[in-house]
Regions:
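Gly/Ser/Thr-rich beta-alpha loop segments that engage phosphate groups in nucleotides
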Residues: 20, 37-40, 79, 180-182, ...
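Active-site glycine/GP-rich loop and adjacent strand/helix microenvironment
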Residues: 94-240
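Short, conserved acidic/polar surface loops in the N-terminal third of protein domains
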Residues: 42-46, 66, 83-86, 111, ...
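Short glycine-enriched loops at secondary-structure junctions
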Residues: 50, 77-79, 126-127
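Acidic/glycine-enriched edge-of-secondary-structure segments
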Residues: 38-52, 88-98, 118-122
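Nucleotide 5′-phosphate-binding alpha/beta core
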Residues: 1-32, 37-55, 59-63, 68-69
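Short Gly/charged-rich anion-binding patches and loops
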Residues: 28, 56, 86, 108, ...
Length: 240
């Protein structure tokens, strides 16, 4: 049986809850995109969805070398955006301490990072660079900070940015991949080798297809990435 693709247009055409696959009584959280290019794309989560999402993000953090003894400073935005609450849940799931900073308020970010001894920073790569410059301008010696790992995503970044972040903050900078339409961050992640993305294939089954024939391409060929995922609350099988 061939299944049709679900696209962002389908989510918008069925705004807000037309693609929900469970009763609203089973949906315990709702996230949505900003809606800057159209109606927001809305995704609901059951308790099982939240648990599996936290597990996927936990794997990313573990692959970065983080663990129970770490202090996570989560500087992604909290709210409808998935980054803040997603990273928060993943860090708590491995037993780490979490500072729910959210984005902005850079001066306080630096103060608490310094005073609390944050060891893992979660934010966008562009904000990490901004923080690095702000720390330098603050006059606080870099050696007084305990940061060792950065989990960066939610926007494109380059290897040059990675090297600049690592040099300025004295950390290892890792990419975390996701998309809000099928949960959020944690679909894929780097490991300590920093040489490509590992996918949580027991939760998100990837295929690369020819957009014209809709058939899988041969290894090494360019195509469109689609995911079939195990999310209970929303029907998007597979998502293109």
């Amino acid at each position: 049986v061939k299944l049709p693709f679900t696209t962002k247009h389908d989510l918008r055409d069925n705004y807000p809850f037309g693609l929900c696959a469970v009763p609203m009584s089973q949906i315990v959280r709702i996230h949505a995109s900003s809606g800057t290019t159209g109606k927001p794309t809305v995704v609901g989560y059951t308790r099982k969805d939240l648990a599996s999402w936290a597990e996927c993000i936990s794997r990313a953090f573990t692959a970065y070398g983080a663990g129970r003894s770490d202090i996570f400073q989560v500087s992604y935005g909290y709210g409808l955006f998935t980054g803040g609450l997603g990273a928060h849940a993943g860090a708590e799931n491995i037993g780490a301490s979490v500072i729910p900073m959210s984005s902005g308020n850079t001066e306080k970010q630096i103060t608490l990072m310094h005073d609390f001894g944050s060891t893992v920073l979660c934010c966008t790569p562009s904000y990490a660079l901004y923080l690095a410059d702000a720390i330098k301008d603050s006059g606080l010696p870099r050696e007084e900070f305990q940061l060792k790992v950065g989990a960066f995503g939610a926007e494109p970044w380059t290897e040059n940015m990675r090297h600049e972040i690592e040099e300025k903050l004295g950390i290892k900078a890792y990419d975390i991949y996701g998309l809000s339409e099928i949960a959020g961050p944690g679909v894929g992640y780097e490991c300590e080798c920093q040489n490509g993305t590992h996918l949580n294939e027991d939760h998100y089954f990837p295929e690369i297809i020819d957009p014209n024939t809709l058939q899988p391409v041969e290894p090494g060929q360019t195509g469109e990435l689609v995911f079939t995922h195990r999310v209970y609350a929303v029907t998007s099988l597979p998502y293109a």
